[in-house]
Amino acid sequence: MGSFNKHETTEGSRKIASFFDEGTFVEIGAYIKRGEDGKEYEGVVCGYGSVDGKLAFVFAQDSDRMKGAFDALHAKKIKMLYDMAVKNGAPVIGIFDSVGALVNEGVSSLAAYGTFMECVSKASGVVPQIAVISGVCSGMSAVVAAMFDMAITVKGSSQIYMSTADKAEGFCAAVEADDEQQAFANARKLISILPANNRDSSEKATSDDCNRTVEFDCNNVIESIVDDADFVEVFANCGGDSMKTGFAFVGGLLCGIVYANGDMTGKGAKKAAKFIGFCDSFGISVVTLVNTRGFAADMCACASAGFARLAYAYTTATTPKITAVIGEAIGAGYTLMGSKSVGADIEFAVVASQISALTAEKAVAFLMNDKITADKSRESLEAEWKEEKANPVEAAERGAIDDVIESSELRQRLCAALYMLSDKAESKPSRKHANLPV
């Protein structure tokens, strides 16, 4: 008979217990051991508990048990956890810290990674999945972590690489934390606001008046329109500053905010596409804010795939989609950033916005150079273009947007549209899936 030491404190058990509300962690598969002699406990701790009162399932790879080496039993424990999480409609959090496959097991450990990947793939879009990378995450573990909806890394501790540690760059984390406790706090924050599963919704009582007027500029617009100025940004370090994504409550309803503020890049478009896809999976309304002149001037043709993914994301999403042009929406920036033509349910523009195929400067240079005279300056022609061709009323008259509003009305109009669309039901033609670009 084996010795009774399931409550031995290890690095993995410490991490998983500290993640949950105090006293709520319940371990599953605690007695599972590896090897023929059965002397070593498996290098992953699994269990469930409460996060701000919500059920969640967590596995933590245990660096104190054979450095968290991955084998068939490791995958079996994780599969047990995933089966329970999906049946109960609760999110999964994975704490990654493993040296990799247990090489003594040969192909069995390699097949175990396939089992792990299948668990993550089948749960994708069913329950939220968040990876916290607190230590080593290499090779196929890095592939699995990238399959999660969002990953949280820790400065100075996360070691993410495919083949050699000196190539550890380029991983797109949703959040980069200063330390492990902040990483856990960020994961708990996300779990507390997100729906528990794809049949759930997320609402929050608020005292922030839906009808309050707002004042904003392009730097603080998000904080001005969301409830209590509380915006949880994700993927901040991916794709540049010109594309911002994150979660907030607007009128008590959870929304995914996508904000294009500057020249669009392929990486920024890819980030927005992933975020919109997540929101669509869990019925989270997407609010798009637009202030862009379109493509960045120095992009290569390879960026087209990122923009193609963005187009797919908007056109295939059936969740409520609301777009507001708050500055410029020029050329491809208008079309790709949640326009009505790619599926927005409601789109409006503030009075001072500009919607046009070209900027005023380019329009005059390409189309009106011959009209520049001593009496008609380039500047006056550009002003005429903005007034006559880029005026949002022109777009409204053509049915490209639904309304032109005062900027002070932005929050109340967003709230009204969100409430109207809260019971939206839309179906798409039957198919397996879209064929995404590479």
Model regions and ranges:
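Ligand-binding clefts of soluble mixed alpha/beta catalytic domains
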Residues: 1-438
